[in-house]
Design a protein with these regions (language model features):
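Bilobed "Venus flytrap"/periplasmic-binding protein-like clamshell domains
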Residues: 1-46, 146-150
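Conserved C-terminal helix/tail region of periplasmic/extracytoplasmic solute-binding proteins
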Residues: 154-177
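Secondary-structure end/capping motifs
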Residues: 84-154
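Short secondary-structure boundary/hinge segments and terminal tails
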Residues: 29, 48, 131, 172-174
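Short, surface-exposed acidic
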Residues: 16-18, 119-128, 162-167
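Short secondary-structure transition/capping segments
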Residues: 65-73, 148-159
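Pocket-lining segment of extracytoplasmic ligand-binding domains
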Residues: 22-115
Length: 177
């Protein structure tokens, strides 16, 4: 399993027992007693309260406290270097344009995002989208890039990321780094 949420869980709790299930089945399986707890992702981060579930750990807060305020890296867009510099820059440019459009046209962007909202109401959709489509989506900023590198380094130390990957050599296209 190679997701940033899973890696955050392992960094926070070490070697814990896990079962892999589709993300939209996590809350129902906790509610029906199949599992004692679950790693809640996507809109479940907002909707778990509707089910009277207790938070054991908020990984974002945990990472923020651990790093002195850095944001927890969740997801991200990557481009293979073998595609060449121009392709990397073009993909970055068009992705950035898409995000900027969403920020300038929130009503249209939110309507588009509803397709993937899995039944959430408009207000929850707005809150969820604003968590992941914001100024930091366009530019991680210096502390965001440092956070990504630290997260990868800790994942390597824990054995979740191959040791020959050089996070210091990682490029953030368009960041003027």
């Amino acid at each position: 399993l190679m997701t940033s949420a899973y890696m955050g869980l392992r960094l926070a709790w070490g070697d814990c027992e896990v079962a892999v299930v589709p993300f939209d089945e996590i809350i129902p399986r906790v509610l029906d007693g199949t599992y004692m707890s679950g790693l809640i992702i996507h809109e479940g981060q907002l909707t778990y309260v509707e089910h009277d579930l207790h938070v054991h750990i908020d990984l974002g807060i945990w990472w923020n406290e651990r790093t002195g305020g850095w944001p927890m890296p969740l997801g991200g867009n990557v481009v293979r270097r073998d595609l060449g510099q121009q392709a990397m820059e073009d993909i970055t440019k068009y992705t950035k344009m898409s995000i900027e459009f969403a920020l300038k046209s929130p009503a249209e962007a939110l309507e588009f995002a509803k397709k993937w909202g899995r039944g959430i109401d408009d207000e929850t959709n707005k809150e969820f989208v604003s968590m992941y489509v914001n100024d930091r989506t366009i530019d991680y900023k210096e502390e965001g890039r440092a956070s990504v590198r630290k997260f990868i380094g800790e994942g390597q130390d824990f054995g979740l990321i191959r040791s020959d990957f050089n996070a210091a050599d990682m490029s953030f296209i368009g960041s003027n780094e």
